[in-house]
From Swiss-Prot:
Extent of Basic residues compositional bias: 1-16
Membrane among keywords: no
Origin organism lineage: Bacteria, Pseudomonadati, Pseudomonadota, Betaproteobacteria, Burkholderiales
Record-linked HAMAP family: Ribosomal_bL35
Gene Ontology BP terms: translation
Protein name listed in UniProt: Large ribosomal subunit protein bL35
Family of the protein in this entry: Belongs to the bacterial ribosomal protein bL35 family.
Gene responsible for this protein: rpmI
């Protein structure tokens, strides 16, 4: 059986934490920021974790990562 391949787009966008959770960046932060309030942009800072309902998809895209 051949090796399972990691989705190259997923490995650039997600990081697996030691506890098995997956870290991701926030969306809606790249452009068209002038119409967004400062408070809205502030809340989009930093990274968040992938929701547990999407962890099955993460495990398929990132095999061998201990998810």
């Amino acid at each position: 059986m051949p090796k399972m391949k990691t989705k190259s787009g997923a490995k650039k966008r997600f990081r697996v934490r030691p506890g098995g959770t997956v870290k991701r960046g926030q969306a809606f932060k790249r452009h068209i920021l002038t119409k967004k309030t400062t408070k809205n942009k502030r809340h989009l800072r930093g990274a968040v974790t992938v929701h547990e309902t999407n962890m099955g998809h993460m495990a398929q895209m990132l095999p061998g990562q201990g998810i």
